Each structure stands twice: as C-alpha cells, then as structure tokens.
Amino acid sequence: MSQGKIVQIIGAVVDVEFPRDMIPRVYDALKLDENGLTLEVQQLLGDGVVRTIAMGSSDGLKRGMTVSNTGSPITVPVGKGTLGRIVDVLGTPVDEAGPIDTDKSRAIHQAAPKFDELSSTTELLETGIKVIDLLCPFAKGGKVGLFGGAGVGKTVNMMELINNIAKAHSGLSVFSGVGERTREGNDFYHEMKDSNVLDKVAMVYGQMNEPPGNRLRVALTGLTMAEYFRDEKDENGKGRDVLFFVDNIYRYTLAGTEVSALLGRMPSAVGYQPTLAEEMGRLQERITSTQTGSITSIQAVYVPADDLTDPSPATTFAHLDATVVLSRDIASLGIYPAVDPLDSTSRQLDPMVLGQEHYDVARGVQSTLQKYKELRDIIAILGMDELSDEDKLAVMRARKIQRFLSQPFHVAEVFTGSPGKYVALRDTIAGFKAILNGEYDHLPEQAFYMVGSIEEAVEKAKTLN
C-alpha cells in the first residue's frame, strides 16, 4: 500500500505526489490517513504527481497530508443487504440503521456488456398514465427520459411512475438521487416506507449540497447495484428485471462540468466539458438488458432554459428508447401531467409492437392535435366562426382529447385532494378511440378534465349538467 503527500488543493481537485515506482492507476481510490476522505485518481501528471477528485468536502485539507493508495477503484456493497437502505456515493449507509448486511462488493467502474451479451425486447411496460401508455409507450428493459425545464413536473411524474410500476412490479428497484433536493429524497424514502415496498428498493443519494465529486459518481454507484441484481443468477440461471431511476441526469453532467476546468480541460460548447459525450456514453451504455436480466431505466433530464438543443439534453436524447417531453405551455393550461403529445416519442410506436388498433388510435390523436395546433393562429385572429364545419369538429375533439390526456396522480393527492387514478392500457385505447369516433361529441369538454377512464368523464358530465 503506497503512500503519497498532498501537494496542491484547488476546490474539489487535489494533487498528490507518490514515489515514482508506486504511482496509482487512473480511477484508483486514495484515502486520507487523517480524516478518511476518499480521493479518486483522474490524471497522471508526470513526476509522480496524480490529479484526483475529492469524494467529499476538501475543507481543512492542507499540503503535506499523508494519503494511502487502496490499490482498487471505489467499491460499494451490492446484493440483498442494500435493499431498504440509503447509501452515499461510497456505499456508506446514511440512514442510521447500522452497517449494511452483505459480504459482496463491486467496483463502480465496470465495462459495458459486450454486443453479443445484449438482448432486445419488445415487451411493453404498462405505466397506468394515459398519455404515456398511448403516445410514448415504454419497453421493458428500455431507457426512458423525462425532459422538462424547471417546475413542470419531472420529479412528480417520476414519483408517479415509481408508484405505479415499482409497486405493481414484483422485481427490485434502485433509485439514484443525483444532485437533487434533499427534501425530495426524504419524501421518496417515506413514500416507499408507507407503501410497504421499501424492502424492494435500494437508494443512493448524492444531493445538491454534496461536492461535485460525489454528484459525478453517485449515478455509477446506483448503477453498479442495479447491474449486480441484473447479473446475479438464480438456480435457473436467470438474473432479475431491475428498475433503475435516476433523478437527475443533467446534474451528473453539471458535476462533470464543475470539475472539468479544474482538471485543466478546455471547455467546449456552452461551457460544458469536452468529454461530455464520452461521460454520458460511459454511463448510458452500462444501463442495458442482457440475456441474463434486464434494467429498465427512467431518467429525469433537466432542460436548461427550456432549450432542448442545449448540449446536455441533446447528448442524452441519442441514448433513449422513449422520450417524454414536459411542456411549460401545457402546464400553463393546467393540464397535468404536462406531457407534450406531439414532441414525445417512442421507438415502440409501431403497429408490429403495439398492434394495429393502439397504433391507429395514437396516430389519430396526434393528427387531431396537430390540426388543432395549425388552426390555433386562425382562431386567435378570426375566431371559431370562420372555420369550416369539419375544422370546428376537429378543434372540438382536439380540446376534449387535450383535457382527457390529463390525469390525477396518486403522489399529488395530498396537494390536489382528488384521488389518483391508474388507467389500464385497454381502457385508455377505448376512451380515445371513442372520442375520435365522435361518440362523446355531446359531452362538454370540462367533463374530460382530470378524470381516469372515459366512464368517469360520462359520470362527471352528469354532475356538470
């Protein structure tokens, strides 16, 4: 176990000098003898000096302090013992419930599965959220991004998905909180505890107040735990189907940006790190399904200034199977979830995967909404009266569809007072098909707002009259 000394400290970046014949490797974990702080080697600068990122606060460090090389990358506990527990980036429990009961550990840096180990699937994952199931269906073992600016409901949508999928799904879930609010992490823990599914969830938190080193690596810690569940074979030689939630992928990029300049790299577009695509790829390529088991991942992606062409969300887009775009314009109409039905996409939206009926209804809904979007300027200038009868009918149905895409959430019950609704896929398809066919042209559009199935809209219409 070689020892070195700190020679320079700039924020989260610490330079350590080792004897020439005992230089640590890139990604090795170093430990400070005095306070146990972990450093991760990023670069070898020559002359025995290595540049590292601190996995914790660098307050109180000084030159000349002794550092020991552990000889291996950061390793975290994995396996059943992590379920129901909250750990930090180093796998240390932070929930005051004693040490983690497992003898297995894994390095957080792993190679992505090889091409011949991958498995593709077209099995759908029902979420119970109408707009998602209809227009951007999720695949089991796929990657989904929830894109949105500040305050349009990414975390609430993710919590509802966790509520609907993780509780109904008998498998295991891993939740990685990357640079988000501590309050949300706390709420999530209590939500899981109250629903009695805590024993199926492992939680890894590196929140907003953590140094950039923690936020840069906490997604990898969570992913390492999820990979272990996927790869660990049972007596039948099969792994598990794991759900992996990340909130928020943008903060992972941002942490990389914060340390990139300190590591001496020239910034690229909009000040991001030049290694943005590589860092994103290294994380995303590991989130995949193999022939042993699957990882279905749902990632919240913050969109800076609502600009989807910003390098960070744009880089993330390339890796996803389905994108759920949350729109401020739709949120301002009071329609929640504020999913943009024309901007959200899914690779599964294909008649070969969904079946002809689902595909036709989804495309019918999109074309009706697209027509309404095109007519909106005419309506704003000339009013509804100038439209042809056919266009008036299309607008009327589009407004009903728009409202029917809203839905009360279980996780928002405490704020809204209206009970959450889970809508089965067949009910969703039947409801929208009936609206498109004009079966509910006689109902007022308010009847379709914030209801679950179409039967509820009919009941609501009776109370309105």
Curated annotation (Swiss-Prot):
GO cellular component terms listed in the entry, alphabetical order: plasma membrane; proton-transporting ATP synthase complex
GO molecular function, one term: proton-transporting ATP synthase activity, rotational mechanism
Entry membrane topology: Peripheral membrane protein
Pfam families with a match to the protein in the record: ATP-synt_ab, ATP-synt_ab_N, ATP-synt_VA_C
EC number from the UniProt entry: 7.1.2.2
Primary location group: membrane
Subcellular location: Cell inner membrane
Function: Produces ATP from ADP in the presence of a proton gradient across the membrane. The catalytic sites are hosted primarily by the beta subunits.
Name of this chain's protein: ATP synthase subunit beta
Organism of derivation: Neisseria gonorrhoeae (strain ATCC 700825 / FA 1090)
